[in-house]
Amino acid sequence: MNEFQLKYGCNPNQKPSRIFMADGSDLPVEILNGRPGYINFLDAFNGYQLVKELKKATGLPAATSFKHVSPAGAAVGLPLTDVEKKIYWVDEAIGELSPIACAYARARGADRMSSFGDFISLSDVCDVAIAKLIQHEVSDGIVAPGYEPEALEILKAKKKGNYNIIKIDPEYKPEPIERKQVFGVTFEQGRNEFVIDKELLSNVVTENKEITESAKIDMIIALITLKYTQSNSVCYVKNGQAIGIGAGQQSRIHCTRLAGQKADNWYLRQNPKVLNLPFKDGVGRADRDNAIDLYIGDEYEDILNDWERVFTEKPSVFTVEEKKEWLAGNTDVTIGSDAFFPFGDNIERAYKSGVKYVAQPGGSVRDDQVIETANKHGMAMCFTGMRLFHH
């Protein structure tokens, strides 16, 4: 199959629509179920590149959760703590999770509000454990290099049998030149084949030169995630997973703030007050996620004024002081940026979210100010020398 007809393009009025191989060769994908759309394929092809590179760079199974051609989460397959299982709604009945299942639980769980209706990409074969995780989530589809038979049957039952399931050829190598059209004009460029690995992290420019091995993995996760995130972008990472991604902002500091707030929310969800919220039986995951998002945010009164809808009793206010005290316990976080930090204010904001390690290209006329700010907070910062814009 060298062509696949789509229902429409980005919007229903954009017809005709298709994906095809210009050279007449076969597409590197097989549609096992459903009818993926234009944006589904954009998510699938970007997401699969991300997880394939993460697996190659870290040696660990990787997963990502995409929405509108940017990752909402990305992670490698490290074991989950009991608290992480709880905030990611991992059902104990599923049993022991495989590394690739842990990777998806982390990728989906980092920013559950943004991952609602996601497109999933896996570096490894989709097993039964992942299928059972996905079974209870609102998701548009999945791409993976293969599927266990039982896992495939579980997934095929989603969305009344219409769940989008794509199998991709892991040996496929795209052409070295990319082309796309905008306003009838064809753009051409070489593919971004830049390799992100530990060697890229050798230029440590701060007084603190100590970067742990786990922090290096987190830096790699941040940078590879940014490589496939709409620019400008900033990514916070901890323990093998993105915990806050700021995508598509015109201002670097707004990226840093947006991603930092998401990272803060990820950590606030682990507070006992949030873990023990008295949800009514039968309240679905999406409603719980929405309630938690309101409860830990500035608009908490909206959920407390309507508490009877989702809670058995009215929760107490999660005060600013309580949140500040809890967030102080979030440490050893890594931040990556797809382009240089132009001012020290980005570092100051990152510090508020527990950042200790920084990976960025460098190259600002104010690099000295940025380094000075990082030194003030005892951070270790490396300059990679490589911009990672993605559009």
Regions found by a protein language model. Give the residues of each.
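C-terminal binding/interaction regions
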Residues: 118, 122-123, 127, 136-166, ...
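Glycine- and Gly-Pro-enriched alpha-helical subdomains that act as flexible
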Residues: 72-112, 243-340
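Flexible, glycine/charged-enriched surface loops at secondary-structure junctions
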Residues: 57-65, 165-168, 231-238, 268-279, ...
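Active-site loops and adjacent core secondary-structure elements that bind or stabilize anionic groups
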Residues: 1-200, 215-233
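Gly-rich Lys/Arg/Thr-decorated short loops/hinges at beta-loop-alpha junctions or inter-strand turns
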Residues: 23-35, 110-116, 189-209, 286-307, ...
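Active-site-proximal loop/turn and secondary-structure-junction residues that shape catalytic pockets
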Residues: 70, 126, 239-241, 249, ...
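Glycine-rich phosphate/pyrophosphate-binding loops
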Residues: 61-62, 67-72, 76-78, 233, ...
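Conserved helix-loop functional segments at active or binding sites
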Residues: 53, 228, 265-269, 352, ...
